A protein has these predicted regions:
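C-terminal transmembrane helical hairpin of 12-TM major facilitator-type secondary transporters
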Residues: 284-331
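Central cavity-lining transmembrane alpha-helices of secondary-active solute carriers
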Residues: 47-65, 264-276
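Helix-loop-helix hairpin linking two adjacent transmembrane segments in secondary transporters
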Residues: 134, 139-196
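Extracytoplasmic gate region of multi-pass secondary transporters
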Residues: 27-29, 216-264, 271
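Intracellular juxtamembrane helix-capping segments at the cytosolic ends
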Residues: 119-133, 325-340
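Cytoplasmic helix-loop-helix junction between adjacent transmembrane helices
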Residues: 103, 109-145
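C-terminal ends and interior cores of transmembrane alpha-helices
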Residues: 81-99, 296-308
């Protein structure tokens, strides 16, 4: 009982860290504000999200190797510090002499945000395996639910800061960075002072090529492809769902903005899926649950292809949102459990996908 209670207490700073992982989604939340403040074109504003996620390709596998050298907890701490620094820097853009220098400060900030998030996503999942001895997929899914909370509130805070008349130290929408900086500090201190029993590091740490060779394992390769499909569905649904609704339900004169609620509907069911999935997977066999959510996504694709009524398209969005919310955690957990001696490297490969 004491070990169970200790594990639950240890998970608290880890879940706060999952919340900081959601900071990366503030890029989309503030891109419109930045476009207005800096007079950016659409293509320039859309470059910021690409800048953030570019670093996943570069840092994911090296982070897996770094964990073998310094340990998982230290690697996660480094990622939180980088992320916290990233959200701290924009608070000082008013001290920069020109708009151009302010913009470069944001470029550096978002680059650090991407680097920190790549390191964090790669290292925090193996860290959880040292705390939770059972129900790994369920715990990782709950962590994704906590992350989704940060993703959900980021645009709300930015919008409030941009429109409120309350005194915000002149920060306007940048108040989001201040609040997230404070949470980042809490995450850093809480994890730093939490004792986590680490597994011994791999004395023969894998190199980059050795990590890529792991794709020779059928399970690892299929998991890698599964993660890529998960990301593709996630990004694709966000981008295309409003356009599909406009095409099928729109009337002459309607604009895309009328159907942007499709993205919110998707995220609502994705968040619901993370929360309920973390509970269901403690009761139901993971393979059975995985089969159910795959069927849900299959039905969703049918709805997107053939649906013409509003309820059919809404159902398709809800099904893919709920189903896709649990794919990442299930696939990643099964991949890491299949190679218990190479969890760090497996995590790096999966995040690179």
């Amino acid at each position: 009982m004491n070990n169970s209670n200790n594990s639950k207490l240890t998970l608290i700073p880890v879940m706060i860290t999952f919340f900081t992982m959601g900071f990366v989604d503030l890029v989309g939340a503030v891109s419109n504000n930045m476009q207005e403040d800096f007079g950016l074109s659409d293509s320039a504003a859309n470059f910021f999200p690409s800048l953030v996620f570019f670093w996943f390709l570069i840092f994911s596998v090296p982070t897996g190797m770094l964990m073998n050298k310094i340990g998982r907890k230290k690697t996660v701490l480094i990622s939180i510090i980088i992320t916290t620094l990233a959200v701290f820097m924009p608070l000082f853009d008013s001290f920069m002499p020109t708009k151009e220098s302010q913009l470069w400060l944001m470029y550096v900030s978002f680059s650090l945000l991407g680097i920190g998030n790549a390191v964090m996503q790669t290292s925090i999942n193996p860290l959880v395996t040292m705390i939770v001895k059972g129900h790994l997929a369920s715990t990782l899914t709950f962590g994704q639910f906590v992350k989704a909370i940060a993703s959900f509130i980021a645009p709300l805070i930015a919008a409030w800061g941009a429109t409120t008349t309350a005194p915000l130290l002149g920060l306007s929408w940048r108040i989001l960075f201040l609040l997230f900086f404070l949470v980042g500090m809490i995450a850093t201190l809480s994890l730093a002072f939490t004792h986590i029993e680490e597994e011994p590091g791999d004395e023969k740490a894998s190199g980059f090529v050795d990590c890529l060779k792991m794709l020779g394992s059928p399970l690892i390769l299929l998991s890698f492809i599964g993660i890529m499909c998960h990301v593709g569905i996630d990004v694709g649904t966000n981008a295309v769902a409003p356009k599909i609704l406009l095409e099928r339900l729109g009337e002459p004169g309607d604009s895309l903005s009328k159907f942007e609620y499709a993205t919110s509907l998707y995220f609502a069911f994705r968040t619901l899926g993370c929360f309920t999935g973390s509970i269901i997977m403690r009761k139901l066999n993971i393979r059975t649950f995985f089969a159910i959510i795959v069927v849900m996504m299959g039905l969703s694709m049918i709805g997107f292809v053939f649906g013409t009524e509003q309820w059919e398209l809404w159902a398709a969005i809800a099904l893919v949102g709920y189903g896709n919310s649990n794919v990442f955690s299930i696939v990643l957990s099964q991949a890491m459990l299949s190679e218990p001696e190479k969890k760090n490297e497996v995590s790096g490969l999966m995040i690179m996908g």
